[in-house]
Regions:
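Solvent-exposed soluble domains appended to multi-pass membrane proteins
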Residues: 1-361, 365-420
Length: 420
Protein backbone atom coordinates (compact mmCIF):
# COMPACT_ATOMS: atom_id res chain seq x y z
CA UNK A 1 0.00 0.00 0.00
CA UNK A 2 1.15 3.56 -0.55
CA UNK A 3 2.70 5.87 2.04
CA UNK A 4 0.02 7.30 4.35
CA UNK A 5 2.20 10.25 5.41
CA UNK A 6 4.18 11.51 2.39
CA UNK A 7 4.16 15.14 3.51
CA UNK A 8 5.27 14.43 7.06
CA UNK A 9 7.95 12.02 5.89
CA UNK A 10 9.26 14.70 3.54
CA UNK A 11 9.38 17.15 6.46
CA UNK A 12 11.28 14.60 8.57
CA UNK A 13 13.94 14.39 5.85
CA UNK A 14 14.51 18.14 5.75
CA UNK A 15 13.61 19.68 9.12
CA UNK A 16 14.29 19.15 12.82
CA UNK A 17 12.31 16.26 14.25
CA UNK A 18 12.42 13.36 16.67
CA UNK A 19 10.42 11.31 19.13
CA UNK A 20 8.03 13.28 21.30
CA UNK A 21 7.43 11.93 24.81
CA UNK A 22 3.82 12.49 25.86
CA UNK A 23 2.09 11.97 29.22
CA UNK A 24 -0.65 9.61 28.01
CA UNK A 25 -1.54 6.86 25.57
CA UNK A 26 -4.88 6.14 23.88
CA UNK A 27 -6.50 9.32 25.23
CA UNK A 28 -5.56 12.50 27.06
CA UNK A 29 -5.07 15.05 24.30
CA UNK A 30 -5.61 17.85 26.80
CA UNK A 31 -2.74 16.73 29.01
CA UNK A 32 -0.26 16.84 26.15
CA UNK A 33 -1.62 20.29 25.29
CA UNK A 34 -1.12 21.41 28.86
CA UNK A 35 2.52 20.32 28.89
CA UNK A 36 3.19 22.01 25.55
CA UNK A 37 1.47 25.28 26.44
CA UNK A 38 2.78 25.66 30.00
CA UNK A 39 6.09 23.80 30.01
CA UNK A 40 4.93 21.98 33.15
CA UNK A 41 5.47 18.28 33.76
CA UNK A 42 2.31 16.21 34.39
CA UNK A 43 4.40 13.93 36.61
CA UNK A 44 3.93 16.46 39.38
CA UNK A 45 0.13 16.42 39.27
CA UNK A 46 -2.20 13.85 40.81
CA UNK A 47 -2.54 10.40 39.21
CA UNK A 48 -5.02 10.62 36.35
CA UNK A 49 -5.46 14.37 36.81
CA UNK A 50 -6.42 16.61 33.91
CA UNK A 51 -5.24 20.16 34.76
CA UNK A 52 -7.71 21.46 32.16
CA UNK A 53 -10.51 20.13 34.38
CA UNK A 54 -9.00 21.10 37.71
CA UNK A 55 -6.58 24.01 37.96
CA UNK A 56 -6.53 25.78 34.61
CA UNK A 57 -10.27 26.05 34.05
CA UNK A 58 -10.52 28.10 37.24
CA UNK A 59 -7.19 29.92 37.60
CA UNK A 60 -5.07 32.21 35.40
CA UNK A 61 -2.12 30.17 34.13
CA UNK A 62 1.11 31.44 32.60
CA UNK A 63 1.56 29.92 29.15
CA UNK A 64 3.09 30.27 25.71
CA UNK A 65 0.30 32.74 24.98
CA UNK A 66 1.31 35.07 27.83
CA UNK A 67 5.01 34.64 27.04
CA UNK A 68 4.56 35.69 23.41
CA UNK A 69 1.90 38.32 24.11
CA UNK A 70 4.46 40.10 26.30
CA UNK A 71 6.57 40.48 23.15
CA UNK A 72 3.70 41.89 21.11
CA UNK A 73 2.37 38.75 19.47
CA UNK A 74 -1.29 38.20 18.76
CA UNK A 75 -2.30 34.87 20.31
CA UNK A 76 -4.98 32.59 18.90
CA UNK A 77 -6.30 29.11 19.65
CA UNK A 78 -8.25 26.97 17.18
CA UNK A 79 -10.02 23.63 17.52
CA UNK A 80 -12.39 21.87 15.13
CA UNK A 81 -14.39 20.48 18.04
CA UNK A 82 -16.72 22.27 20.44
CA UNK A 83 -15.55 25.07 22.71
CA UNK A 84 -16.52 23.37 25.97
CA UNK A 85 -14.71 20.12 25.13
CA UNK A 86 -12.20 19.65 27.99
CA UNK A 87 -13.30 23.11 29.24
CA UNK A 88 -11.05 24.64 26.56
CA UNK A 89 -12.92 27.95 26.41
CA UNK A 90 -12.26 28.55 30.09
CA UNK A 91 -8.72 27.16 29.93
CA UNK A 92 -7.57 29.14 26.89
CA UNK A 93 -9.05 32.30 28.41
CA UNK A 94 -7.15 31.66 31.63
CA UNK A 95 -3.98 31.05 29.62
CA UNK A 96 -4.17 34.51 28.10
CA UNK A 97 -5.17 33.84 24.49
CA UNK A 98 -6.69 36.73 22.56
CA UNK A 99 -9.10 34.59 20.56
CA UNK A 100 -10.40 31.03 20.42
CA UNK A 101 -12.10 29.79 17.26
CA UNK A 102 -13.93 26.57 18.08
CA UNK A 103 -16.27 24.44 15.97
CA UNK A 104 -19.16 26.75 16.84
CA UNK A 105 -17.53 29.34 14.54
CA UNK A 106 -16.78 26.98 11.65
CA UNK A 107 -18.96 25.72 8.83
CA UNK A 108 -17.74 22.15 8.81
CA UNK A 109 -18.80 20.52 5.54
CA UNK A 110 -16.60 17.43 5.60
CA UNK A 111 -16.73 14.94 8.47
CA UNK A 112 -15.33 11.48 9.05
CA UNK A 113 -17.57 8.43 8.98
CA UNK A 114 -17.53 8.70 12.79
CA UNK A 115 -18.73 12.30 12.70
CA UNK A 116 -15.51 14.17 13.56
CA UNK A 117 -14.65 17.31 11.61
CA UNK A 118 -12.02 16.79 8.94
CA UNK A 119 -8.91 18.88 9.48
CA UNK A 120 -9.05 20.52 6.05
CA UNK A 121 -11.37 23.12 7.65
CA UNK A 122 -8.50 24.40 9.81
CA UNK A 123 -6.28 25.96 7.15
CA UNK A 124 -8.64 28.83 6.32
CA UNK A 125 -9.22 29.61 9.99
CA UNK A 126 -5.48 29.61 10.75
CA UNK A 127 -4.99 32.10 7.90
CA UNK A 128 -7.87 34.26 9.17
CA UNK A 129 -6.41 34.29 12.68
CA UNK A 130 -3.11 35.59 11.33
CA UNK A 131 -4.93 38.16 9.19
CA UNK A 132 -6.62 39.75 12.23
CA UNK A 133 -3.41 41.43 13.39
CA UNK A 134 -0.62 43.40 11.77
CA UNK A 135 2.05 42.04 14.10
CA UNK A 136 3.44 38.54 14.54
CA UNK A 137 1.05 35.81 15.66
CA UNK A 138 1.13 32.65 17.75
CA UNK A 139 -1.57 30.24 16.57
CA UNK A 140 -2.14 27.05 18.58
CA UNK A 141 -4.30 24.56 16.70
CA UNK A 142 -5.82 21.31 17.96
CA UNK A 143 -7.09 18.94 15.28
CA UNK A 144 -9.68 16.22 15.81
CA UNK A 145 -9.95 14.13 12.63
CA UNK A 146 -7.96 11.18 13.96
CA UNK A 147 -10.06 10.89 17.12
CA UNK A 148 -11.44 7.47 18.12
CA UNK A 149 -13.32 5.29 18.49
CA UNK A 150 -12.33 3.30 15.43
CA UNK A 151 -15.07 1.21 13.78
CA UNK A 152 -14.73 -2.57 13.66
CA UNK A 153 -16.80 -2.72 10.47
CA UNK A 154 -15.71 -1.37 7.11
CA UNK A 155 -17.17 2.13 6.81
CA UNK A 156 -15.02 3.65 4.04
CA UNK A 157 -16.32 2.50 0.66
CA UNK A 158 -13.20 3.13 -1.40
CA UNK A 159 -10.27 3.63 0.98
CA UNK A 160 -7.24 5.41 -0.43
CA UNK A 161 -5.01 3.27 1.75
CA UNK A 162 -5.77 -0.44 2.09
CA UNK A 163 -4.56 -2.43 5.08
CA UNK A 164 -3.47 -6.02 4.51
CA UNK A 165 -1.88 -8.78 6.53
CA UNK A 166 -4.18 -8.61 9.58
CA UNK A 167 -6.27 -11.76 10.05
CA UNK A 168 -8.66 -10.28 12.62
CA UNK A 169 -11.27 -8.57 10.42
CA UNK A 170 -12.42 -6.15 13.13
CA UNK A 171 -8.86 -5.04 13.88
CA UNK A 172 -8.12 -4.72 10.17
CA UNK A 173 -11.13 -2.42 9.74
CA UNK A 174 -10.07 -0.28 12.70
CA UNK A 175 -6.58 0.17 11.29
CA UNK A 176 -7.88 0.86 7.79
CA UNK A 177 -10.20 3.56 9.09
CA UNK A 178 -7.43 5.11 11.20
CA UNK A 179 -4.73 5.07 8.54
CA UNK A 180 -7.06 6.72 6.01
CA UNK A 181 -7.76 9.52 8.49
CA UNK A 182 -4.00 9.85 8.95
CA UNK A 183 -3.59 10.10 5.17
CA UNK A 184 -6.09 12.97 4.96
CA UNK A 185 -4.51 14.68 7.97
CA UNK A 186 -1.17 14.44 6.17
CA UNK A 187 -2.77 16.15 3.17
CA UNK A 188 -3.81 18.93 5.55
CA UNK A 189 -0.18 19.20 6.67
CA UNK A 190 0.89 19.73 3.06
CA UNK A 191 -1.90 22.24 2.39
CA UNK A 192 -1.07 24.23 5.52
CA UNK A 193 2.64 24.45 4.70
CA UNK A 194 1.77 25.61 1.18
CA UNK A 195 -0.61 28.27 2.54
CA UNK A 196 2.01 29.55 4.99
CA UNK A 197 4.68 29.61 2.28
CA UNK A 198 2.42 31.68 0.04
CA UNK A 199 2.15 34.36 2.73
CA UNK A 200 5.88 34.98 2.34
CA UNK A 201 6.30 35.85 6.02
CA UNK A 202 8.98 34.54 8.40
CA UNK A 203 7.25 31.52 9.91
CA UNK A 204 7.76 28.42 12.03
CA UNK A 205 5.20 25.60 12.06
CA UNK A 206 5.45 22.82 14.65
CA UNK A 207 3.54 19.55 14.25
CA UNK A 208 3.30 17.01 17.07
CA UNK A 209 1.26 13.92 17.91
CA UNK A 210 -0.68 14.11 21.17
CA UNK A 211 -0.82 10.36 21.89
CA UNK A 212 -0.93 6.97 20.19
CA UNK A 213 -4.38 5.61 19.24
CA UNK A 214 -6.40 3.09 21.23
CA UNK A 215 -5.46 0.03 19.20
CA UNK A 216 -4.18 -2.37 21.84
CA UNK A 217 -0.61 -1.55 20.90
CA UNK A 218 2.31 -3.02 22.81
CA UNK A 219 5.80 -1.57 23.11
CA UNK A 220 7.25 -4.31 20.91
CA UNK A 221 4.90 -3.22 18.10
CA UNK A 222 6.62 0.15 17.89
CA UNK A 223 9.85 1.24 16.25
CA UNK A 224 10.69 3.30 19.34
CA UNK A 225 9.69 0.46 21.70
CA UNK A 226 7.87 2.99 23.89
CA UNK A 227 4.11 3.57 24.08
CA UNK A 228 4.50 7.18 25.18
CA UNK A 229 6.45 8.29 22.11
CA UNK A 230 4.86 10.06 19.18
CA UNK A 231 6.69 12.34 16.72
CA UNK A 232 7.25 16.05 16.20
CA UNK A 233 8.72 18.12 13.39
CA UNK A 234 9.59 21.83 13.16
CA UNK A 235 9.14 23.37 9.71
CA UNK A 236 10.46 26.87 9.03
CA UNK A 237 11.24 29.25 6.18
CA UNK A 238 13.96 31.18 7.99
CA UNK A 239 16.87 28.79 7.58
CA UNK A 240 16.97 27.10 10.99
CA UNK A 241 19.61 24.39 11.16
CA UNK A 242 18.29 20.82 11.17
CA UNK A 243 18.84 19.47 14.67
CA UNK A 244 17.15 16.14 15.38
CA UNK A 245 16.58 15.17 18.99
CA UNK A 246 14.02 13.42 21.18
CA UNK A 247 12.20 15.69 23.62
CA UNK A 248 9.31 15.48 26.11
CA UNK A 249 6.19 17.54 25.48
CA UNK A 250 6.90 19.92 28.35
CA UNK A 251 10.18 21.01 26.71
CA UNK A 252 8.80 21.63 23.22
CA UNK A 253 8.00 25.34 23.48
CA UNK A 254 11.23 26.19 25.28
CA UNK A 255 13.14 24.34 22.54
CA UNK A 256 11.36 26.19 19.73
CA UNK A 257 11.64 29.57 21.45
CA UNK A 258 15.33 29.00 22.16
CA UNK A 259 16.03 28.33 18.48
CA UNK A 260 14.35 31.66 17.73
CA UNK A 261 16.40 33.41 20.44
CA UNK A 262 13.21 34.13 22.37
CA UNK A 263 13.58 34.01 26.13
CA UNK A 264 10.17 34.75 27.62
CA UNK A 265 8.03 32.90 30.12
CA UNK A 266 9.04 31.75 33.59
CA UNK A 267 8.93 28.00 32.99
CA UNK A 268 10.27 28.19 29.44
CA UNK A 269 13.25 30.24 30.65
CA UNK A 270 13.80 27.68 33.40
CA UNK A 271 14.04 24.87 30.84
CA UNK A 272 16.40 26.88 28.65
CA UNK A 273 18.74 27.63 31.55
CA UNK A 274 18.53 24.48 33.66
CA UNK A 275 17.85 21.55 31.31
CA UNK A 276 20.47 18.87 31.87
CA UNK A 277 21.78 20.37 35.11
CA UNK A 278 21.78 18.89 38.61
CA UNK A 279 18.36 18.81 40.33
CA UNK A 280 16.69 20.01 37.12
CA UNK A 281 13.52 17.94 37.58
CA UNK A 282 13.23 18.26 41.37
CA UNK A 283 13.61 22.03 41.09
CA UNK A 284 11.02 22.04 38.28
CA UNK A 285 8.60 20.36 40.68
CA UNK A 286 9.23 23.11 43.25
CA UNK A 287 8.79 25.81 40.62
CA UNK A 288 5.49 24.32 39.48
CA UNK A 289 4.24 24.11 43.06
CA UNK A 290 5.14 27.73 43.72
CA UNK A 291 3.33 28.91 40.59
CA UNK A 292 0.22 26.75 40.98
CA UNK A 293 -0.33 26.26 44.71
CA UNK A 294 2.30 28.28 46.55
CA UNK A 295 2.77 32.00 47.11
CA UNK A 296 4.23 32.64 43.65
CA UNK A 297 7.53 33.91 44.98
CA UNK A 298 8.95 33.54 41.48
CA UNK A 299 6.64 36.30 40.24
CA UNK A 300 7.66 38.76 42.95
CA UNK A 301 4.12 40.15 43.07
CA UNK A 302 3.83 40.59 39.30
CA UNK A 303 2.02 37.58 37.87
CA UNK A 304 2.11 37.41 34.04
CA UNK A 305 -1.69 37.01 33.95
CA UNK A 306 -4.33 37.85 36.53
CA UNK A 307 -7.46 37.48 34.39
CA UNK A 308 -8.41 36.49 30.87
CA UNK A 309 -9.54 38.75 28.05
CA UNK A 310 -10.31 36.22 25.33
CA UNK A 311 -12.93 36.64 22.61
CA UNK A 312 -14.55 33.61 21.03
CA UNK A 313 -14.25 33.58 17.26
CA UNK A 314 -12.69 35.96 14.76
CA UNK A 315 -15.55 37.10 12.55
CA UNK A 316 -18.60 39.10 13.60
CA UNK A 317 -22.05 37.82 12.72
CA UNK A 318 -23.99 40.57 10.95
CA UNK A 319 -27.64 40.77 9.82
CA UNK A 320 -28.72 42.39 6.56
CA UNK A 321 -32.44 41.71 6.05
CA UNK A 322 -35.42 39.68 7.18
CA UNK A 323 -38.06 38.47 4.73
CA UNK A 324 -41.52 37.05 5.61
CA UNK A 325 -42.14 33.51 4.39
CA UNK A 326 -45.33 32.65 2.49
CA UNK A 327 -47.28 30.98 5.28
CA UNK A 328 -45.57 31.98 8.52
CA UNK A 329 -42.19 32.83 9.93
CA UNK A 330 -39.23 34.61 8.39
CA UNK A 331 -35.96 34.11 6.56
CA UNK A 332 -33.11 35.97 8.24
CA UNK A 333 -30.17 36.96 6.02
CA UNK A 334 -26.69 38.00 7.07
CA UNK A 335 -23.07 36.86 7.21
CA UNK A 336 -21.00 34.29 9.10
CA UNK A 337 -23.84 32.08 10.34
CA UNK A 338 -22.99 28.50 11.33
CA UNK A 339 -25.15 25.60 12.42
CA UNK A 340 -24.44 26.74 15.99
CA UNK A 341 -26.05 30.15 15.37
CA UNK A 342 -29.19 30.78 17.41
CA UNK A 343 -31.63 33.65 16.97
CA UNK A 344 -32.92 35.63 19.94
CA UNK A 345 -35.90 38.00 19.89
CA UNK A 346 -36.13 40.29 22.92
CA UNK A 347 -33.71 37.92 24.65
CA UNK A 348 -35.76 34.78 23.99
CA UNK A 349 -34.22 31.99 21.91
CA UNK A 350 -36.30 31.16 18.82
CA UNK A 351 -36.89 27.90 17.00
CA UNK A 352 -34.70 28.20 13.93
CA UNK A 353 -33.09 26.17 11.16
CA UNK A 354 -29.68 26.85 9.64
CA UNK A 355 -29.62 26.78 5.84
CA UNK A 356 -26.17 28.18 5.05
CA UNK A 357 -23.71 30.82 6.20
CA UNK A 358 -26.00 33.62 4.98
CA UNK A 359 -29.52 32.37 5.83
CA UNK A 360 -31.45 31.12 8.86
CA UNK A 361 -35.18 30.32 8.80
CA UNK A 362 -37.51 31.18 11.68
CA UNK A 363 -40.59 29.00 11.23
CA UNK A 364 -42.64 29.98 14.28
CA UNK A 365 -41.51 33.51 15.07
CA UNK A 366 -43.95 36.42 14.97
CA UNK A 367 -42.45 39.90 14.91
CA UNK A 368 -43.80 43.33 15.68
CA UNK A 369 -42.23 46.75 15.37
CA UNK A 370 -39.74 47.41 18.14
CA UNK A 371 -38.68 43.80 18.62
CA UNK A 372 -34.94 43.35 19.10
CA UNK A 373 -33.13 40.58 17.21
CA UNK A 374 -29.69 39.13 17.91
CA UNK A 375 -27.79 36.07 16.74
CA UNK A 376 -25.54 34.19 19.14
CA UNK A 377 -23.01 31.41 18.66
CA UNK A 378 -24.12 28.81 21.18
CA UNK A 379 -22.23 25.82 22.52
CA UNK A 380 -23.16 22.93 24.78
CA UNK A 381 -25.25 23.61 27.88
CA UNK A 382 -26.52 26.75 26.11
CA UNK A 383 -23.21 28.56 26.55
CA UNK A 384 -23.47 31.77 24.53
CA UNK A 385 -19.94 32.26 23.26
CA UNK A 386 -20.57 35.42 21.25
CA UNK A 387 -23.47 37.72 20.37
CA UNK A 388 -24.06 39.90 17.32
CA UNK A 389 -25.12 43.51 17.51
CA UNK A 390 -28.78 44.14 18.30
CA UNK A 391 -31.12 44.90 15.41
CA UNK A 392 -34.51 46.56 15.87
CA UNK A 393 -37.33 45.30 13.66
CA UNK A 394 -39.07 48.35 12.19
CA UNK A 395 -41.50 48.41 9.24
CA UNK A 396 -40.09 45.15 7.88
CA UNK A 397 -36.49 46.39 8.10
CA UNK A 398 -33.61 45.71 10.46
CA UNK A 399 -32.09 48.76 12.14
CA UNK A 400 -28.68 48.06 13.61
CA UNK A 401 -27.89 49.32 17.11
CA UNK A 402 -24.19 50.07 16.74
CA UNK A 403 -21.88 48.92 19.50
CA UNK A 404 -24.33 46.50 21.12
CA UNK A 405 -22.47 43.28 20.29
CA UNK A 406 -20.71 41.25 22.94
CA UNK A 407 -18.05 43.19 24.82
CA UNK A 408 -14.95 42.69 22.67
CA UNK A 409 -12.73 42.52 25.74
CA UNK A 410 -14.29 39.17 26.63
CA UNK A 411 -17.09 37.48 24.79
CA UNK A 412 -18.72 35.11 27.24
CA UNK A 413 -19.26 34.25 30.89
CA UNK A 414 -17.06 31.57 32.43
CA UNK A 415 -18.84 28.26 32.97
CA UNK A 416 -18.19 26.21 36.09
CA UNK A 417 -19.26 22.86 34.64
CA UNK A 418 -17.33 20.22 32.75
CA UNK A 419 -18.28 19.12 29.27
CA UNK A 420 -15.83 16.57 27.88
Amino acid sequence: SEDACPNLHNLYQNYSNGYFKVPSVGAGTANTEFEVLTGMNLRYFGPGEYPYKTYSKKHPTESAATALASLGYGTHALHDNTGNFYSRANVFNNMGFDTFTSKEFMNVLQTTENGWAKDEILTQHIMEAMDTTKQEDFVFTVSVQGHGNYPETQVIENPKIKVEGIEDEALKNKWEYYVNQVYEMDQFVGDLIKAVEERNEPSVVVFYGDHLPTMGLKAEDLKSRYLYNTNYVIWDNIGLQKDDKNIPAYQLMSEVLNRLDIHSGTVFNYHQQRKGTKNYLSDLELLQYDILYGKQYVYNGKAPITEGHMVMGIRNVSLSSIVPQLNSGYSLYGENFTKYSRVYVNGEKQKSSFLNNTRINLSETELKDGDVIQVGQVGSSDTIFRMSDKYTYQNGQLVKQEGTATDKSKSWVDQDYDVN
